[in-house]
Design a protein with these regions (language model features):
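Conserved SAM/SAH cofactor-binding pocket of Class I
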Residues: 195-218
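Non-catalytic accessory regions of SAM-dependent methyltransferases
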Residues: 1-93
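Non-catalytic substrate-recognition/targeting regions of SAM-dependent transferases
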Residues: 79-90, 110-185, 194
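Conserved hydrophobic/aromatic pocket- or pore-lining residues that grip, position, or stack substrates
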Residues: 94, 173, 192, 209
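A short interface-forming secondary-structure element
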Residues: 93-106
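Short, surface-exposed beta-strand-loop junctions and turns on beta-sheet-rich folds
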Residues: 31, 104-106, 181-182
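S-adenosylmethionine
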Residues: 1-24, 102, 154, 164-171, ...
């Protein structure tokens, strides 16, 4: 049951049947996921500074775990795993490709995008553009419009070709982030490709149903 008035996308507290606080998330009664939890701290204030701290943590974690080379080609934000429900951010060198799949995240994406650009640049990283790949049907289920295109922000480009060359596991790829599946390349499979390469070494292997050929190239 819901107590009090709300609009879809608003932050709401979730409590147990005994009134115990369980977490806070954004509400959307159009979605099959009624509430997406973003925090389990009742003292959090969900302003721009809150999301900036979350972005800072995600960036620092990647840099520590992946090192400088892989950091230029990786998934910077991985949805709920980074406590950003419904948000994917992939970095392809100087291009950030995003996908927003929840109404609550859509309403707060400007804060997150601004934090990404500013914090990456503070770290000495170049960011030329943000390209949104919101051309997915799940957005319709969230009550959101589908679409794709360059995100408009001062200092970002909006006239790039849609292709970028990346290096992953010492292999170069031409990524089509405008027309390729999802964000253009499955960066979340980076370590699976490394594992497959070890298993396949010295063997003849058939790569079926390939998208970019990344598993075979490894």
């Amino acid at each position: 049951a819901v107590e009090g008035a709300y609009q879809n996308g608003d932050m709401v507290d979730v409590v147990s049947n005994k009134g115990r606080y369980l977490g806070t998330g954004w509400m959307n009664d159009h979605s099959k996921i009624r509430v997406r939890i973003i925090s389990r701290n009742a003292n959090d204030t969900f302003d721009e500074a809150f999301f900036r701290r979350r972005v800072r943590y995600a960036l620092d974690y990647r840099r520590t775990v992946m090192g400088e080379t892989d950091y230029r080609c990786c998934r910077l934000i991985f949805g709920e795993a980074d406590q950003f429900p419904g948000l994917t951010v992939d970095r392809f060198e100087n291009i950030l490709v995003t996908q927003v799949l929840s109404l609550g995240m859509e309403r707060r994406k400007d804060w997150v995008y601004r934090a990404l650009v500013e914090l990456l640049r503070e770290d000495g990283e170049q960011v030329d553009a943000i390209y949104e790949r919101n051309d997915v049907t799940i957005r319709t289920l969230e009550g959101l419009e589908q679409g794709k295109g360059f995100y408009q922000m001062e200092g970002l480009k909006t006239d790039l070709s849609g292709h970028v060359t990346i290096t992953e596991n010492r292999i170069k790829y031409d990524v089509d982030y405008m027309e390729g599946q999802k964000t253009g390349f499955f960066l979340d499979q980076k370590y699976n490709r490394q594992a497959a390469a070890k298993l396949a070494r010295g063997r003849r292997v058939l790569d079926c149903f390939t998208h970019t050929g990344a598993f075979a190239l490894n």
